[in-house]
Regions:
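Leucine-rich repeat
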Residues: 16-21, 37-42, 57-63, 78-84
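Concave beta-strand-loop units of leucine-rich repeat
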Residues: 1-10, 23-31, 44-51, 65-73, ...
Length: 90
C-alpha cells in the first residue's frame, strides 16, 4: 500500500491486516502508535516524518526506509527486528 506524497491524515484503523508493504509519501507526519498492523514487513516513511517510532513499529517489520535526517537523530529507536535499514536523501 502506497500513499501519495501529499497524504497527511490519521491512519489509525485504516490499514488492512493483509498489508505487508507500507509506504508513506513525503508529507506524512502523523502519530503511528497502534496504527501499523503486525502484517507489515516493509515500511517506508517520507522526508517530513518526525513522529516517535519508539515501540510504535511492530516487530514484524524487517525492512525500514527512513529519510537520513531522521536516522541521524533517532537511530537508537529503530527496532532490533529490522534487518535492512535504508537511509535516503532527496
Amino acid at each position: 500500500l502506497t500513499f501519495r506524497d501529499d497524504f497527511n491524515q490519521d491512519i489509525k484503523g485504516a490499514i488492512s491486516s493483509s498489508v505487508t508493504h507500507l509506504t508513506f509519501g513525503n508529507d506524512f507526519n502523523q502519530d503511528i502508535k497502534g496504527a501499523i498492523p503486525s502484517s507489515v514487513t516493509h515500511l517506508t516513511f517520507g522526508e517530513e516524518f518526525e513522529q516517535s517510532i519508539y515501540k510504535n513499529i511492530p516487530s514484524s517489520v524487517t525492512h525500514l526506509k527512513l529519510f537520513s535526517k531522521f536516522i541521524k537523530r533517532k537511530k537508537e529507536y529503530i527496532p532490533q527486528t529490522v534487518t535492512n535499514l535504508i537511509s535516503y536523501d532527496k
